Amino acid sequence: MTTQPSAPLTYRDAGVDIDAGDALVDRIKPLAARTMRPGVLAGIGGFGALFQVPGKYREPVLVSGTDGVGTKLRLAFEWNRHDTVGVDLVAMSVNDILVQGAEPLFFLDYFACGKLSVDTAAAVVGGIARGCELAGCALIGGETAEMPGMYPDGEYDLAGFAVGAVEKSAILDGKSIQPGDVVLGLASSGAHSNGYSLVRKILDRAGARPDQDFHGQPLADVVMAPTRIYVKQVLAALAAHTGGIKGLAHITGGGLLDNVPRILQPGLSARLHRDAWQMPQLFQWLQQQGGVADTEMHRVFNCGIGMVIVVDAAQADAVAATLAAQGETVSRIGEIVAQKDGEAQTVVV
């Protein structure tokens, strides 16, 4: 016997609020509009976004990157800090494609949750739009997925996707790096978006509170400082010093020890000098509170260097000056040497 349902069901009864999704799109559209740039043919609201590659490129090569924010999001949930993780999301992808010498053109995001909070999602997307403005790329589309039962209330996950372009003849691949080249480092804003599982473990061990004073700032402000976006500054240096910049490394998961080798040919090593830059107070505190060994620090965290630039020694001072004029804090942190037998491709001495 077939039983009749007591009342008709709706999608909202199942946990999906279409009206909330529409309200979020209305909140997002003006945020995305601020990021528009030449080349955008169709953006938010369509089935697909359209972008025309700028005509200035003779042989354009498209460069893509995707990433998330990792467990830094857990602190965003616990501390109710949702306005900066969107900047982190953009930074992780645009800095990655910058490493190939690419200019970021457009960005898409994916926001997944169990129950959609329009205010929370709008705060996150506001950060994404701010990151896109800093990178000079258009927030051209995205996806908001409300999936009941998949995530606890108040939690969400993020993924970002960046596409850029570089002239084929100007691709940075590190193949010209040789012994004697100079290693420059650009300052980070903090832990950026990596190592936060260890950060959270140390915070728990230390009994730290988000509102406690940390050298004149609330600890939460320091820990949640958004990842720096290096795009415009580095692109300016690349344009001003053709051939002088030989390689870039975005210091993300794996720290200095695992990321710099990604741009080095076999037989080369980067020798970095720990006294060449000041490790920020956050990392000093994390190391002390967690009893973390030096090698582990350099393998997990950026330790104050968010982007590494390998340059021809003859142009090192000029490149550093250009970056400083763009507002970067630049340190000469090491040099490229011939790799010794049994030696790692990056050593901190």
Swiss-Prot record:
BP-aspect Gene Ontology terms: 'de novo' IMP biosynthetic process; adenine biosynthetic process
UniProt KW Nucleotide-binding keyword: yes
GO molecular function per UniProt: ATP binding; phosphoribosylamine-glycine ligase activity; phosphoribosylformylglycinamidine cyclo-ligase activity
Entry EC no(s): 6.3.3.1
Known pathway: Purine metabolism; IMP biosynthesis via de novo pathway; 5-amino-1-(5-phospho-D-ribosyl)imidazole from N(2)-formyl-N(1)-(5-phospho-D-ribosyl)glycinamide: step 2/2
Protein family membership: Belongs to the AIR synthase family.
Any matching Pfam family: AIRS_C
Compartments, record wording: Cytoplasm
Gene Ontology CC annotation, any one: cytosol
Species the sequence originates in: Bordetella petrii (strain ATCC BAA-461 / DSM 12804 / CCUG 43448)
This protein's encoding gene: purM
Main location: cytoplasm
Name of protein: Phosphoribosylformylglycinamidine cyclo-ligase
